[in-house]
């Protein structure tokens, strides 16, 4: 697959002589359901995904942002499930408020990474600031994430957020948040967030913000002596 080309849309359009994405999924779903029916012990391993992200071109999209953008706005009655295959996706991910009810599932080794920091300048020569430094921004309610690593690789250069969460009822399971200062920004005032079996590391007040956040069975690792949290 050529760089910057989407496998699902050769030359920018669907090929009517072959199955499109929806048709391929229907056929695959029928096949998987038939196998599960014939071999019931395999049924528990079946998981259906609406979109697949893969850097090698084997999925529907090359980047996580492309998959998020493809989700219909305000899809209220059903969840959209996205599988992220193994790889380091260097992108500044934004999940806008309209992309509700998304489940983002990572294979082992799925990483969303960027290297902005507060004192880094934008195109206008202004400092990005703490909020502008994040590798990922999540605003959409009812967002579920499993087995994804969020990291900021800028190093010990001051505030550098790995994940900025302003979403209500956000649920993170078996995720990792890697950085130094200000790793996890539980930003949203009055919103609720739940973190289960997650790993969070940093140096200076690396868990902070206004949200009501619950951390259940999480490993919180301070990379050196200092404050872990800075509640607002």
Language-model segments: residues:
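Catalytic His-Asp segment of secreted/periplasmic serine-dependent ester chemistry enzymes
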Residues: 1-46
């Amino acid at each position: 697959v050529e760089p910057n080309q989407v496998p699902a849309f050769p030359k920018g359009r669907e090929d009517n002589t072959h199955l499109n994405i929806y048709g391929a999924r229907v056929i695959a779903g029928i096949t998987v359901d038939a196998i599960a029916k014939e071999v019931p012990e395999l049924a528990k391993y079946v998981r259906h995904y609406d979109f697949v992200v893969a850097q090698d071109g084997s999925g529907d999209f090359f980047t996580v942002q492309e998959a998020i953008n493809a989700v219909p706005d305000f899809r209220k009655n059903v969840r959209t499930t996205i599988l992220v295959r193994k790889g380091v996706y260097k992108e500044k991910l934004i999940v806008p408020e309209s992309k509700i009810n998304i489940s983002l599932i990572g294979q082992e080794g799925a990483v969303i990474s960027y290297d902005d920091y507060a004192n880094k300048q934008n195109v206008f020569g202004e400092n990005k600031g703490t909020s502008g430094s994040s590798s990922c921004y999540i605003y959409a309610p009812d967002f579920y994430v499993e087995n994804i690593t969020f990291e900021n690789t800028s190093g010990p250069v001051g505030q550098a957020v790995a994940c900025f969460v302003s979403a209500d009822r956000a649920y993170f399971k078996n995720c990792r948040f890697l950085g130094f200062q200000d790793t996890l920004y539980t930003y949203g005032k009055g919103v609720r967030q739940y973190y289960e079996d997650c790993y969070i590391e940093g140096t200076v007040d690396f868990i902070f913000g206004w949200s009501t956040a619950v951390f259940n069975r999480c490993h919180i690792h301070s990379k050196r002596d200092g404050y872990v949290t800075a509640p607002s």
